[in-house]
């Protein structure tokens, strides 16, 4: 299994210029990929940011030469028209051949209600149906042909994308449960999940579901890039490693809260009520490199080959330096 390392560019935490510089630093520190969150609103009102993901990708693309760039993740189904998303990614695919991927998910109310979604926030069944339809439409458009598409949610009439990269754009499907993970196995070029939810989720549900989906579609599961965002707060100062997780307290809210709360002020209020011990449970918090690697290893053993590291602290350059010095050599040794 070939191990790849990625950097999570946290658009909820850093402004546009700083976030671009961090992407450039990620390549300089040996990362193979950099993925960016796509939020219209951040998890936090105070101190939060939300630069536009696609502007970030093009800016970093111009200043790097080998880094794979993508979203983790974008929802191409509500505030975006999937045909326009397909056009945007096709353009980036032409500008940075072989380096662009589109990571997609079913969406959160936080980003869609503020931009005018009307009515009740849809249940998972509809959000998932929209996602499948959007992916199907985008892939048709990436063939470069004229597309007449009549779906339940989206429609095109004689639509063409005139500049498309050879082979289209790889689509990575984000999943937190087996239903979407099976879809990733059937249809995804890649699969995305996040760490810190109990190893049985990955070993007994997600990875078997990806394999099941691939088998039903007569695909080789080994050809699917299996990406996981590793939530890690590593610092040689143990107190700093723990305290750095505090900004990301919203990640420790329940799935229902994260998918239904549509106001960053309310999200921040709910998150700040959590004790630091509960916040830190979502993270690998370590000051010893061997301890950190020991906690990362089970994800590799589960078959996840593309590790994207999300560090919570404000000094991201420090994390990249420590990762390159302390963690990367040990992790590559596991391969």
Swiss-Prot record:
Biological processes per GO annotation: carbohydrate metabolic process
Annotated keywords: Carbohydrate metabolism, Oxidoreductase, Plasmid
Give the matching CDD domains: Tetrahydromethanopterin_reductase (cd01097)
TM segment ranges: none
GO MF, one example: glucose-6-phosphate dehydrogenase (coenzyme F420) activity
Catalytically driven reaction(s): oxidized coenzyme F420-(gamma-L-Glu)(n) + D-glucose 6-phosphate + H(+) = 6-phospho-D-glucono-1,5-lactone + reduced coenzyme F420-(gamma-L-Glu)(n)
| E.C. code | 1.1.98.2
* Keyword Kinase in record: no
Active site (UniProt) = 39, 108
Q: Where does substrate bind?
A: 194, 197, 258, 282
**From which domain of life does this come?**
Bacteria
Q: Name one Pfam family in it.
A: Bac_luciferase
What are the binding positions for coenzyme F420-(gamma-Glu)n in this chain? 38, 75, 106-107, 111, 176-177, 179-180
Query: Kind of enzyme, top EC level?
Result: oxidoreductase
Assembly state and interactors? Answer: Homodimer.
Q: Which PANTHER family match?
A: 5,10-METHYLENETETRAHYDROMETHANOPTERIN REDUCTASE, PTHR43244
**Function, as annotated:** Catalyzes the coenzyme F420-dependent oxidation of glucose 6-phosphate (G6P) to 6-phosphogluconolactone.
Q: Which family does it belong to?
A: Belongs to the F420-dependent glucose-6-phosphate dehydrogenase family.
Q: What is this protein called?
A: F420-dependent glucose-6-phosphate dehydrogenase 1
Gene behind this chain?
fgd1
């Amino acid at each position: 299994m070939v191990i790849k390392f990625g950097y999570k560019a946290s658009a909820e935490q850093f402004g546009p210029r700083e976030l671009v510089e961090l992407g450039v630093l990620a390549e300089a520190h040996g990362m193979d990929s950099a993925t960016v969150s796509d939020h219209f609103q951040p998890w936090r009102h105070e101190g939060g940011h939300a630069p536009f993901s696609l502007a970030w990708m093009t800016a970093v693309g111009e200043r790097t030469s080998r880094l794979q760039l993508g979203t983790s993740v974008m929802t191409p189904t509500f505030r975006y028209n999937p045909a326009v998303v397909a056009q945007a990614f096709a353009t980036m695919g032409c500008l940075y051949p072989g380096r662009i991927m589109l990571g997609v998910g079913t969406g959160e109310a936080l980003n869609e209600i503020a931009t005018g979604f009307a009515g009740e926030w849809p249940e998972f069944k509809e959000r998932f149906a929209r996602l499948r339809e959007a992916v199907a439409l985008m892939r048709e458009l990436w063939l470069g042909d004229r597309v007449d598409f009549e779906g339940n949610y989206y429609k095109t009439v004689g639509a063409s994308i005139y500049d498309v990269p050879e082979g289209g754009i790889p689509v990575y499907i984000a999943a937190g449960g087996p239903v979407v993970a099976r879809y990733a196995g059937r249809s995804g070029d890649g699969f995305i999940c996040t760490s810190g939810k109990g190893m049985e989720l990955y070993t007994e549900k997600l990875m078997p579901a990806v394999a099941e989906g691939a088998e039903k579609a007569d695909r080789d599961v080994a050809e699917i890039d299996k990406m996981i965002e590793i939530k890690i707060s590593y610092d040689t100062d143990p107190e700093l490693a723990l305290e750095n997780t505090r900004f990301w307290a919203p990640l420790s809210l329940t799935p229902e809260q994260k998918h239904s709360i549509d106001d960053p002020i309310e999200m921040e209020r709910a998150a700040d009520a959590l004790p630091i011990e509960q916040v830190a449970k979502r993270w690998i918090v370590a000051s010893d490199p061997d301890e950190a690697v020991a906690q990362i290893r089970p994800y590799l053993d589960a078959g996840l080959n593309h590790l994207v590291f999300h560090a919570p602290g404000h000094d991201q350059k420090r994390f990249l330096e420590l990762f390159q010095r302390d963690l990367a050599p040990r992790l590559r040794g596991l391969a």
